[in-house]
């Protein structure tokens, strides 16, 4: 059985306090357990030993409405805690062709017998139970809208903090971290923030949004260091050559800005100009995946 409950309390006008608790249980999918495939240049291996994950999550928060002259909106603040047991996570590394574990010595023997080219067949991701995990955090947001003469202002801002860590991790699991000293779960950003601001004047609207994502403290170590025991022509082999240097140059995180301008031509049509990644920031949300450069879009919308 899975148990969940929640409630909301309204102690005064425009004030809402909420709390909730819920249990969760997830079986591994058929693909995670039995299917071997190749997606987007990456081998996906099955794991017949994988076990279901389960856990619970709790949240408490408050939402407060406000009005200051012609400006009104609400502020929302909440804290949360999630606990996982036998948490499932895709782990990148070398696996045997059937998805079972393969030692460095066995892998080196395969390369010696068949050449370096065969190594790609053993490299990929596999869903794996990573023991237990603890994810506390909090988030805050503000939404508001108001008028100043003929101008209409709207703002949306939010911030999220999480600190996901394993519970009593063993040394074998930590050895797969690019920075085991931090013990933060892989592929997570501790800080995320966003603000969106727009001004409307009659038929014209201009707006901007700014997003900040903190440095991803941990990824699979296989992406940042040479492959153990694999040497070609006297040089160590890397999966993503230079990625470790790329990460070290971006330890302050990424700030990405977008801008937009639109004109109401008639009551049923609108012309918009959008610029995504205004300052052409080069950034990545995971190893080997560089996100979009500056993009300019012209859009015409017509309502029938």
Predicted region positions:
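Exposed loop/turn and edge beta-strand positions of beta-sandwich/beta-sheet ligand-binding modules
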Residues: 1, 44-46, 56, 71, ...
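Conserved C-terminal beta-signal and adjacent last beta-strands/turns
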Residues: 8, 19-20, 51-59, 151-161, ...
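Surface-exposed extracellular loop regions of Gram-negative outer-membrane beta-barrel proteins
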Residues: 9, 13-58, 72, 79-121, ...
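Asparagine-centered polar/low-complexity signal
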Residues: 47, 128-129, 277
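Hydrophobic transmembrane alpha-helices and their helix-loop junctions in integral membrane proteins
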Residues: 61-64
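Gram-negative outer-membrane beta-barrel transporters
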Residues: 70, 79-83, 100-222, 268
């Amino acid at each position: 059985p899975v148990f969940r409950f929640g409630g909301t309390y309204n102690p005064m006008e425009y004030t809402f306090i909420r709390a909730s608790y819920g249990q969760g249980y997830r079986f591994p999918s058929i693909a995670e357990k039995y299917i071997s495939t190749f997606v987007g240049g990456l081998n996906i291996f099955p794991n017949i030993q994988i076990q279901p994950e389960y856990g619970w999550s709790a949240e408490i928060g408050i939402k407060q409405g406000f009005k200051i002259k012609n400006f009104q909106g609400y502020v929302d603040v909440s804290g949360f805690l999630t606990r996982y047991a036998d948490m499932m996570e895709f782990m990148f590394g070398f696996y045997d062709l059937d998805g079972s574990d393969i030692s460095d010595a066995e892998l080196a023997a395969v390369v010696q017998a068949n050449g370096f080219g065969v190594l790609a067949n053993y490299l990929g991701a596999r869903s794996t139970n990573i023991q237990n995990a603890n994810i506390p955090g909090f988030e805050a947001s503000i939404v508001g809208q108001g008028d100043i003469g003929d101008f209409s202002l709207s703002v949306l801002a939010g911030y999220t903090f999480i600190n996901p860590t394993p519970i009593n991790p063993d040394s074998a699991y930590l050895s797969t971290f690019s920075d085991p000293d931090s013990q933060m779960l892989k592929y997570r950003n501790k800080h995320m923030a966003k603000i969106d601001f727009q001004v409307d004047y009659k038929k014209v609207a201009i707006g901007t949004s700014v997003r900040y994502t903190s440095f991803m403290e941990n990824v699979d170590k296989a992406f940042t260091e040479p492959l153990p025991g694999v040497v070609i022509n006297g040089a160590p082999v890397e999966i993503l050559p230079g990625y470790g240097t790329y990460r070290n140059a971006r330890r302050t995180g990424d700030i990405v800005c977008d801008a937009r301008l639109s004109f109401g031509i008639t009551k049923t049509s609108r012309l918009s100009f959008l610029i995504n990644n205004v300052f052409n920031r080069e950034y990545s949300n995971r190893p080997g995946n560089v996100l979009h450069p500056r993009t300019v879009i012209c859009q015409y919308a017509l309502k029938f």
